Regions:
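N-terminal low-complexity, acidic/polar interaction/targeting segments
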Residues: 1-223
Length: 223
C-alpha cells in the first residue's frame, strides 16, 4: 500500500489516456508543487467524483482510479498551472484520507487479469470497428443538431462532449482495450465501469453491451 496525492474529477482517465488540466485551486497548486519536488516521475492519482463538484471539496469519490504521470507543466502565473498528464496504470483505492492539505488516498496498483487471453487481439479488432461506427454515428447526429441540442446529446451519452478526432489504438491488446474505452462516445459512469472491469476480456464484453445502448440512442436521434 502507498499514500498518493489524488485529483478527483468529473471525468475518467484511463491508462494510455491524456489528461490536460488547468490548475487554479490553492490546494491543487500545492499538490502539483509537491509532486514535482518528489523523487521519481511526478505523478498523482485521478479518480471519478460520483456526487458533488470538482472545486471546493465535499465531493463523493469512487474507489478505482488511474495514476497520471505529468508530461508537461507550465506555471501560467503565480496562481495557475497548465499541465498535461498521461494515464499509466490502474489503482485500487483502499481508503480516502483527510484532505490535508489536498486529497490523498491509500492505494494499491491493480493490474488486469487474463492479459494473455486467447483471441484477445481479434476481439480488440472487432470492438475497434464498433467504436469507430459509434463515433461516426455520434458525429452524424452532432452535425444535424444546433448548439443546444448538442448539449442534450452529450447529456444523453453521459454528459461528455462528443470526440470526433483521431481513433487509432495501441498495438498492445491490453492497452488497446483502455484506448477503446477512452474513444467510445460514452459518459463517465460507463467509462468508470470499463476501468473497473477485472481484465481485458470483461472490458470488451462490457463495452459491447454499452455500445448496444449508445447505438440505439443515436439511431433513434437520426430516425
Amino acid at each position: 500500500m502507498a499514500v498518493m496525492a489524488m485529483f478527483p474529477l468529473g471525468s475518467v482517465l484511463l491508462p494510455g489516456g491524456i489528461l490536460p488540466l488547468h490548475v487554479f485551486e490553492p490546494r491543487y497548486r500545492d499538490m502539483i508543487r509537491d509532486c514535482l519536488r518528489a523523487d521519481g516521475e511526478p505523478e498523482f492519482g485521478q479518480a471519478l467524483i460520483s456526487h458533488g463538484w470538482e472545486t471546493g471539496g465535499g465531493d463523493d469519490r469512487l474507489m478505482v482510479g488511474t495514476v497520471a504521470q505529468m508530461l508537461q507543466v507550465e506555471a501560467i502565473d503565480e496562481n495557475r498551472y497548465a499541465l498535461v498528464a498521461v494515464g499509466t496504470r490502474r489503482i485500487k483505492i483502499n481508503a480516502w484520507l483527510p484532505d490535508d492539505p489536498y486529497p490523498m488516498a491509500d492505494v494499491d496498483d491493480w493490474p488486469d487479469v487474463d492479459v494473455d487471453a486467447p483471441g484477445l487481439a481479434v476481439d480488440v479488432a472487432a470492438s475497434h470497428a464498433r467504436v469507430r461506427a459509434a463515433r461516426a454515428l455520434a458525429a452524424e447526429v452532432s452535425a444535424l443538431l444546433d448548439d443546444s441540442d448538442e448539449t442534450d446529446l452529450a447529456a444523453g451519452i453521459g454528459g461528455e462532449p462528443i470526440d470526433t478526432g483521431d481513433d487509432e489504438i495501441s498495438d498492445d491488446p491490453l492497452l488497446a482495450t483502455y484506448h477503446l474505452a477512452t474513444l467510445a462516445p460514452i459518459g463517465p459512469a460507463d467509462r468508470y465501469r470499463l476501468l473497473a472491469a477485472p481484465g481485458p476480456v470483461e472490458r470488451l464484453d462490457m463495452l459491447d453491451e454499452i455500445l448496444d445502448d449508445v447505438e440505439a440512442m443515436l439511431k433513434f436521434r437520426l430516425s
